[in-house]
Amino acid sequence: MPELPEVETLKNSLKDKLIGLIIENVELKRDNLRYKLSPLLATEILNTNILDVRRRAKYLIIDFNNDYSLIVHLGMSGRFTLQSANYKTQKHDHVIFDLSNGEKLIFNDTRRFGMIYSFKTDLLEKEFFNDLGIEPFSDLLTLEYLKDKLQTKKIPIKNLIMDNRVIVGVGNIYASESLHLARIHPDKSGNDLRDDEIENLIKAIRDVLTKAITAGGTTLKDFVNGDNKPGYFTKQLKVYGREGQSCLSCSSTIIKIKHSGRSTFYCKTCQYS
């Protein structure tokens, strides 16, 4: 599933190309996504001007000049790409936006776990994103904030940093990578972390996410950016997906365990605490 770096990469690839364009037509090809497409989607943003393209957590947001925004979640296999005017519709295209420059913006989702909504812009944070925690790069992510969130939590730190009510956008891949960089065992209880470990973890999360964004995200199977290009952070993964291989830091063997049904990868030598 695309995480923060993938959505940030998608945003960066689309923003300059979309701002200022007009949505001339919206074609709903297939509404059989996990959350059924609303017929209003075809009319609420019709003939509107694109003001901005931004990200909140793992959501892509496109703002229009009629006080509405398009909210896109890629789910497991969603793709949101720019295509030329002569683009031929594909089997799993769900929504096609015709743009004023002749190009098409396509939402394609093979596994249909994605979602796409239109929503009043000024109500997004209050009603749509009201349960989300803070962004990893926000100044609000401090030792005091995270310590307060962790001090009563007797559950694995890996689960806690993946909780979008605490920090948004840190999915399975980047949780494993961040904990390895911070040298923290993924099973360690959140309330057992020392202050210096919490500070190291915040720094590690930011460092890993920054490197992933710079590399264009991680493509394990489906992810591509708005230009239909994959991400290359896969080549920089230190532990994720490397079960049985040597740790790149100490040569110990990478171990795979499960947390809440998800695969976790770590090094027992580097992540001793």
UniProtKB/Swiss-Prot annotation:
Organism name: Rickettsia rickettsii (strain Sheila Smith)
Superkingdom: Bacteria
MF GO annotations: 8-oxo-7,8-dihydroguanine DNA N-glycosylase activity; class I DNA-(apurinic or apyrimidinic site) endonuclease activity; damaged DNA binding; zinc ion binding
HAMAP family xref list: Fapy_DNA_glycosyl
Protein name stated in the entry: Formamidopyrimidine-DNA glycosylase
Entry annotated with the keyword Hydrolase: yes
CDD domains xrefs: EcFpg-like_N (cd08966)
InterPro entries, per the entry: DNA_glyclase/AP_lyase_DNA-bd, DNA_glyclase_Znf_dom_DNA_BS, Formamido-pyr_DNA_Glyclase, FPG_cat, MutM-like_N-ter, Ribosomal_uS13-like_H2TH, Znf_DNA_glyclase/AP_lyase, Znf_FPG/IleRS
Disulfide topology: none
